[in-house]
């Protein structure tokens, strides 16, 4: 419940509150095995929604719960899908990820056809029911794509023709699936003359292969760096962002899988360079990449050291007044950009992430150290996170963040300030109750504070 994820917020309604109703929620069924789930899906000729709850981010799960609470949504999923809700460490999820060759999956929505083929992967949660309606429509359309199924059957039978591999690469990239192995198999079949074509260069770029991958080495070996950069810049901005995001995701996964610190430093530099016109964003995302890496590989010593540096010298070093000015300037620029565009428009307020990260890392210190000096620093970060939220959130009713208060209360308790911790936690609970949101996790924390077991 302590980890806060920054979500995309509409300019017209930055903080949307949806009242949850269990009667209106998508109906989730329990299954003892993958075989049982697919058997029912095939019998009813329906696709499958596997909604995966985060192990660490309780608020992310609450957000999904709200998003899946809508009458129209319930009806659509009941008619077209078998839906099941699983936790990150459930055996059913392990069966599914093994079947579809997913290395890992933390949270979000997986859509399968009734044969067990992955047709859509969403790596986030949202409180917007409309988003889940859009996912359903997309999954239904993709489930009718018999072309991909036919290609996969031929691949499983041992075929490795150029035509088959290029078809699989193109189809799987549409559903954000890892195409690294397929691309390398395809490149192995090409002559040097074929590799040196712009078509091959485009194919490699569009797949967003990880840094240090053989495919990237190939393209930079046969083309000058300037040629590759020029080709990349020829794509529309939206496509370039997608390609960079693929590179970042695939490289991060590779670095974590092999605990490769050299690779993560290269990724940190790569991410910083994508924000070369904005030093603040370059510094923020570059440092966050390192901190997240050491957390994921469970290197506590390096994690705490990098997190402390990130907080002290970047996040905490900027005053509230400065953040307010920069946030206002950014927001005005976004409004100006909105005036030049047609249709819907959304953006993620960058400077709010300072508060989110301070909160998240303060709580990580609560979990990983008993050093009173470090905990005292974490308490300051936690307090600053609440101040940032209050200063930058435009909606008066959302300025107080109960989840940040929850972190603050936990740290107060650990530092021996039990009465103040109880008072803070009670205030956080009152805010959640006034908004009609779930209070279960915060009530559990309050109980542990009172009985001295937190």
Predicted regions and their residues:
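Oxidative protein folding and maturation machinery
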Residues: 152-454
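Non-catalytic, surface beta->alpha helical segment in thiol-disulfide oxidoreductase systems
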Residues: 68-69, 102-147
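A short beta-strand-turn-helix
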Residues: 28-48
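Thiol-based oxidoreductase modules, predominantly thioredoxin-like and allied folds used
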Residues: 27-32, 52-53, 70-93
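Structural alpha/beta surface segment adjacent to cysteine/selenocysteine redox centers
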Residues: 90-106
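Loop/turn elements at helix/coil->beta-strand transitions in domains of secreted/extracellular proteins
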Residues: 44-48, 79-84, 106-107, 113-117
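Conserved redox-active cysteine motifs that mediate thiol-disulfide chemistry
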Residues: 52-66
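Bacterial Sec-dependent N-terminal signal peptides
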Residues: 1-28
């Amino acid at each position: 419940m302590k980890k806060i994820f920054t979500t995309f917020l509409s300019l017209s309604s930055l903080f949307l509150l949806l009242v949850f109703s269990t009667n209106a929620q998508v109906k989730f069924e329990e299954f003892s095995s993958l075989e049982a789930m697919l058997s029912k899906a095939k019998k009813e000729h329906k696709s499958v929604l596997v909604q995966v709850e985060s192990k660490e981010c309780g608020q992310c799960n609450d957000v999904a719960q709200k998003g899946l609470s809508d009458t129209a949504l319930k009806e659509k999923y009941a008619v077209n899908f078998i839906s099941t809700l699983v936790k990150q460490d459930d055996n059913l999820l392990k069966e599914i990820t093994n079947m579809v060759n997913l290395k890992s999956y933390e949270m979000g929505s997986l859509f399968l056809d009734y044969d067990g083929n992955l047709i859509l992967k969403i790596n986030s949660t949202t409180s917007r029911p409309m988003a889940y309606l859009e996912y359903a429509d997309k999954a239904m359309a993709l489930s009718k794509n018999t072309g991909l199924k036919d290609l996969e059957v031929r691949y499983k039978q041992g075929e490795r023709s150029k035509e088959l591999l290029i078809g699989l690469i193109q189809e799987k990239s549409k559903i954000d699936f890892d195409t690294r192995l397929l691309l390398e198999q395809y490149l192995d079949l090409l002559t040097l003359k074929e590799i040196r074509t712009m078509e091959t260069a485009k194919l490699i770029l569009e797949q967003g292969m990880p840094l240090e991958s053989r495919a990237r080495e190939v393209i930079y070996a046969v083309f000058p760096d300037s040629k590759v950069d020029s080709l990349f810049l020829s794509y529309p901005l939206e496509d370039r962002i997608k390609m960079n995001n693929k590179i970042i995701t695939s490289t991060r996964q590779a670095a974590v899988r092999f605990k490769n610190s050299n690779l993560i430093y290269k990724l940190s530099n790569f991410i910083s360079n994508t924000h070369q016109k904005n030093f603040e964003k370059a510094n923020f995302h570059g440092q966050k990449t390192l901190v997240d890496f050491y957390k994921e590989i469970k290197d506590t010593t390096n994690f705490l050291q990098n997190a402390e540096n990130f907080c002290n010298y970047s996040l905490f070093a900027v005053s509230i007044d400065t953040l307010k000015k920069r946030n206002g300037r950014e927001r005005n620029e976004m409004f100006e950009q909105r005036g030049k565009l047609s249709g819907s428009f959304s953006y993620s307020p960058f400077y709010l992430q300072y508060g989110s990260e301070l909160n998240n890392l303060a709580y990580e210190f609560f979990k990983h150290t008993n050093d009173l000096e470090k905990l005292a620093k974490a308490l300051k970060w936690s307090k600053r996170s609440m101040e940032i939220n209050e200063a930058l959130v435009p909606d008066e009713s959302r300025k107080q963040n109960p989840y940040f208060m929850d972190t603050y209360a936990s740290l107060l308790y650990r530092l021996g300030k039990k009465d103040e911790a109880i008072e803070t936690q009670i205030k956080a609970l009152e805010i959640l109750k006034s908004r009609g949101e779930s209070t279960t996790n915060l009530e559990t924390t309050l109980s542990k504070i009172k009985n001295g077991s937190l």
